[in-house]
């Protein structure tokens, strides 16, 4: 990824033609869509050019069809694709996924203005605008499950992004867009085309308004058949292509599993903490049959606190495209807002150490995301305000997820997993409880009991406290982060957290931990802390988090061809990491597009510790 300070939004001029406002890029000196009629051009060039009406209408049950695009722009092509999907999609569980790249995204205000001219697309435009991402580099997944449609919008330079994409199932069709080659030559570089072909396969089609020599030569070099039918409006030609011929031996393709099937999968998930719940939801939303096993009760472990705070430690902005916490934060906000359990808030992050590094974020991130405002609580420490944050009620979220008709909860202690004939048997003692197509083990440190070699997860004791503060409540939409954290649990109680004791697995609520949590808030907000009742009157909950050796969650298959996966080691950021990591896990199992770059996928890989075995530093449980 190009080490720029931030994503630069598009600079636009506007030209009114027959009452239609046409945006023009100042960066590239070209229009975003045809002055004749951009929507009709999109249908002619990209939809008809890829024969999408017929192809989409004939998708099998549970088939996953993906369309790639080289320039998102105003989103017009994707909206036209979505509209076509509504018109022709079969009445089954097939899914349409779009992958688009944009170096200079429109601001939200400009996007609204640009799309306002297309009355027939307004119902779809509204949904797109609601999920339109913050202008931060990396992949932003927009999900519309009721439509069986999703978008991965990658912000950044195409020359950096396409090589970072990991191939699963091949992209089925491409919209080769992104301004004319004469205006934007970088988009049409051979490196970009090579990676577009790498992500494709025999049968993939390509369409473009451009018939420039650089594009034709680039595709022909890979054995792709090209035709030049009539273009739209005054344009004599357009490009239409299909990959039929064998590819050159010099092109190396990443191996793709042949085990992906267009059938409903029976998924068994062991463990009903936030990892298991979010994974169950991800599969069930795709129409698969999920059985969720829990030995005692859902949220009985570290996920069961009264409140979960989405409080990311943001990275320098040039690292945001592959920074797990930053990407997870954006994805989590988009995920949880669909639940009543979510409360949008802002977080005051105090600068206790390395203050300048934290304060510098206000010069890197957009001003409406990270600001320096006055505080509701008096403190001697500087701070920033993260305006896009949230709090989740875990038990309410659990109830909402378990209401999904595709999820069944069973209370059972699964002791053994046995693989056979493309199935996995789950056994409780000597009894077979279920046969599943895939199993995901989400049991934190106890996951190791179901694998031969499993990363050694460190126990970390933590205790949260809550206390009556009805005499001096804080705003419900604010939280405070200072090494610990505090915010309103409800209208009359303050919740404070959390103690942090590595290599301890005791779970008794201790007065010492209440004292610890009091001392944390007192060190930053002494005037307010002195008003709180004595710690002897506090309530609390203690639990044990599971932390991997390198602090990244453990996500995926422990063996390449296995039907048994794991998702554990989320540490103290379970509610932050879980929604995005569950999408990564589902992508691996079902062969869907990954919502993260290769560099981050490698850091999450469940097999990564198998390459790091050291005699003096064991990464695995002892046998």
From Swiss-Prot:
Matching Pfam families: DAO, Methyltransf_30
Subcellular compartments: Cytoplasm
SUPFAM superfamilies tied to this protein: FAD-linked reductases, C-terminal domain, Nucleotide-binding domain
Catalytically driven reaction(s): 5-aminomethyl-2-thiouridine(34) in tRNA + S-adenosyl-L-methionine = 5-methylaminomethyl-2-thiouridine(34) in tRNA + S-adenosyl-L-homocysteine + H(+)
Key words of the record: Cytoplasm, FAD, Flavoprotein, Methyltransferase, Multifunctional enzyme, Oxidoreductase, S-adenosyl-L-methionine, Transferase, tRNA processing
Gene: mnmC
UniProt family annotation: In the N-terminal section; belongs to the methyltransferase superfamily. tRNA (mnm(5)s(2)U34)-methyltransferase family.
Known function: Catalyzes the last two steps in the biosynthesis of 5-methylaminomethyl-2-thiouridine (mnm(5)s(2)U) at the wobble position (U34) in tRNA. Catalyzes the FAD-dependent demodification of cmnm(5)s(2)U34 to nm(5)s(2)U34, followed by the transfer of a methyl group from S-adenosyl-L-methionine to nm(5)s(2)U34, to form mnm(5)s(2)U34.
Co-factor requirement: FAD
Region (tRNA (mnm(5)s(2)U34)-methyltransferase): 1-244
Protein name: tRNA 5-methylaminomethyl-2-thiouridine biosynthesis bifunctional protein MnmC
Organism: Acinetobacter baumannii (strain AYE)
NCBIfam families: MnmC_Cterm, tRNA_MNMC2
HAMAP family attached to this UniProt entry: MnmC
EC numbers for this chain: 2.1.1.61, 1.5.-.-
GO-annotated cellular components: cytoplasm
